């Protein structure tokens, strides 16, 4: 019987940890759009590769930007 090597999934590294980001500004709309899909929903961390700490920071920044009407709420 032939030996079949299992493929390992590549672990995504957090881009924000690599760049030593300590704060995500809610006024930086271009940066926030990277973590949202085309309908305006926040992408989960398993898709965008954020760690838990930075995913919370992204979530609060997007929520603040939505309240200030800088980023639209979810579009249908």
Swiss-Prot record:
Similarity comment: Belongs to the bacterial ribosomal protein bS18 family.
Keywords assigned by UniProt, alphabetized: Ribonucleoprotein, Ribosomal protein, RNA-binding, rRNA-binding
InterPro entries: Ribosomal_bS18, Ribosomal_bS18_CS, Ribosomal_bS18_sf
One Pfam short name: Ribosomal_S18
Organism listed in the record: Petrotoga mobilis (strain DSM 10674 / SJ95)
Protein name: Small ribosomal subunit protein bS18
Disulfide partners: none
The organism's place on the tree of life at top rank: Bacteria
Molecular function via GO: small ribosomal subunit rRNA binding; structural constituent of ribosome
HAMAP family: Ribosomal_bS18
Subunit structure: Part of the 30S ribosomal subunit. Forms a tight heterodimer with protein bS6.
């Amino acid at each position: 019987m032939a030996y079949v090597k299992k493929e390992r999934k590549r672990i995504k590294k957090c881009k924000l940890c690599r760049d030593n980001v300590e704060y995500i500004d809610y006024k930086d709309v271009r940066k926030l759009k990277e973590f949202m899909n085309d309908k305006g929903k926040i992408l989960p961390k398993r898709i965008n590769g954020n760690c838990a700490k930075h995913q919370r920071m992204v979530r609060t920044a997007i929520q603040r930007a939505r309240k200030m009407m800088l980023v639209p709420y979810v579009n249908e």
